[in-house]
A protein has these predicted regions:
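Bilobed "Venus flytrap"/periplasmic-binding protein-like clamshell domains
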Residues: 2-29, 87-145, 153, 254-257
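Conserved beta-strand segments of alpha/beta enzyme cores
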Residues: 11, 36-37, 73, 129-131, ...
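Short, glycine-/small- and polar/acidic-enriched structural segments
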Residues: 15-102, 109-114
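A local structural motif
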Residues: 30-39, 125-135, 269-274
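Hydrophobic residues within well-ordered alpha-helices
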Residues: 49-51, 142, 263
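Pocket-lining segment of extracytoplasmic ligand-binding domains
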Residues: 134-222
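Secondary-structure end/capping motifs
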Residues: 195-262
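Long, low-complexity C-terminal extensions of enzymes
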Residues: 253, 260-279
Length: 279
């Protein structure tokens, strides 16, 4: 690995869900320059930190690039995505999701990507108009809502509980309606950091790609390591992580641009988000 480095601290964001384990658990076994500092947090926190200049690069919600594309470049061939069911981004509902018009949906505040996605699915695909509140999906508001959007590890726990009659996998619904995969997160780097530290960005990008490949090869042992965090059986963890994809090929780029066009149509996204701009 290229050990490109200088004395400047490089702040790298990493989503603290087990869906990053094939990359991150491998990363943690490797030696890196001492000035490479990893910050673990939910996607929404990483989004804000990257936007505020508190991170230099890292995995963030796809939504973050869609609304502030002029601030970033995308690192090629890295994502958190799915070609169908993702298994950890669900709309849990007490009634048929197509009947949620005028009902209240409680949204997890952990990922702007999934908040926008569930609104696209309900309002554009299903033609219903619920009301939305943001809050703790395990708090008191959960008992008052007809539906709950949950992501990541908390979605895995809710799914296993069997509490809700309807569990809508948003990756699967998107795929059914668009015939495309869905990209939940990308690896983005701040534009000015790219310009000033291209060699460091190259080295970190190279390391992420290496970890991605190694992690897929070591998936069974990684599942034994991370499954207790949920908790879930290692075999279930293996099935779940096998469905998560980490590349960003042509179809995923098309899917990302389609999502961004929906955001633009909704008045949320920037017209500069399409076409994608890579490092």
């Amino acid at each position: 690995m290229n050990k490109a480095s200088n004395n400047k601290i490089v702040r790298i964001g990493m989503v603290n869900f087990i869906n990053t384990a094939p990359i991150y658990e491998t990363w943690k076994t490797r030696s890196h320059p001492e000035n490479w500092h990893v910050v673990e947090a939910p996607p929404s926190t990483l989004n804000q930190m990257l936007a505020d200049g508190e991170l230099d690069l890292g995995f963030v919600s796809s939504y973050e690039y869609g609304v502030r594309p002029e601030k970033y470049r995308i690192l090629p061939d890295l994502s958190i995505s799915a070609n169908g069911p993702v298994g950890s981004v669900f709309l849990f509902s007490r009634i048929d999701p197509k009947l949620l018009d005028n009902h209240t949906i409680l949204l997890s505040g952990q990922s702007e990507t999934s908040i926008a996605l569930v609104k696209i699915i309900l309002e554009k695909f299903y033609r219903v108009q619920p009301s939305y509140i943001v809050g703790n999906v395990n708090g008191e508001k959960a008992n008052e809502a007809s539906g709950i959007l949950a992501i990541g590890d908390e979605a895995l726990r809710l799914s296993a509980s069997g509490e809700f009659q309807y569990q809508l996998d948003l990756g699967e619904v998107w795929c059914n309606y668009t015939d495309l995969p869905f990209v939940f997160a990308i690896c983005a780097v701040r534009e000015e950091f790219c310009m000033e530290n291209a060699e460091i960005v190259d080295a970190i990008h190279e390391e992420f790609l290496f970890c991605k490949g190694e992690g897929r090869q070591a998936l069974e042992s990684i599942c034994l390591q991370v499954a207790p965090r949920i908790p879930m059986h290692p075999d279930e963890c293996y099935v779940y992580l096998r469905a998560i994809k980490y590349g960003l090929g042509d179809r995923k780029q098309l899917a990302l641009e389609k999502y961004y066009n929906y955001l633009i149509e909704r008045g949320e996204g920037s017209a500069l988000s399409v076409p994608l701009q890579f490092f």
